[in-house]
Amino acid sequence: RLNNPHDRFFKEVLGDVANTQAFLETYLPPDVLQTIDVGTIQAEKDSFIEQDLKEFYADLLFRANIRNREAYVYILLEHKSYSDDNVGVQLLRYMSAIWDKEIKKQKNRRLPLILPIVLYQGKEKWGVSTQFADRIEGVETMEGALKKAIPHFEYYLYDFSSNSGEEIKGPDDLRLYLETIRMASIK
């Protein structure tokens, strides 16, 4: 059940593999895009959003070959009207859930890469670091062994808030969807 009208639109548009391929080809940095075989992208049925957060988020999971290895592209849609400091923590939780599922399938296998992507449509421009480690108190002064204890990952953020300046590009269906979520942030 989709709790928010934006969820249905998100899942219909980006749930269509051709639109997801177009989004990745249009928005990912070229050095990342060249590692992904977009022709191998397949939608997965899983969602990892907790029930109490479904009002604020929707997600899609895709399987793809990245550097000739099975991997995932995880897209999180952020419905909140403001930047959320905890998105990195939530992504880490969802990525762990994806890896847990993989471990249950085959225990001794190495875990697949997960490429985390956040689409933001809030009222204000995104103002939170996309580096997970920046969420840790005192990280900027840590060195050596302490710094090694911090999980390090970065998510790709696409800010479609009304004042972000993010250019809307791509095929018609994708542009229409992105313009619509941008306009929804104005209300």
Please give the residue ranges for each predicted region.
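Conserved single-residue anchors adjacent to enzymatic active/cofactor-binding motifs
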Residues: 1-187
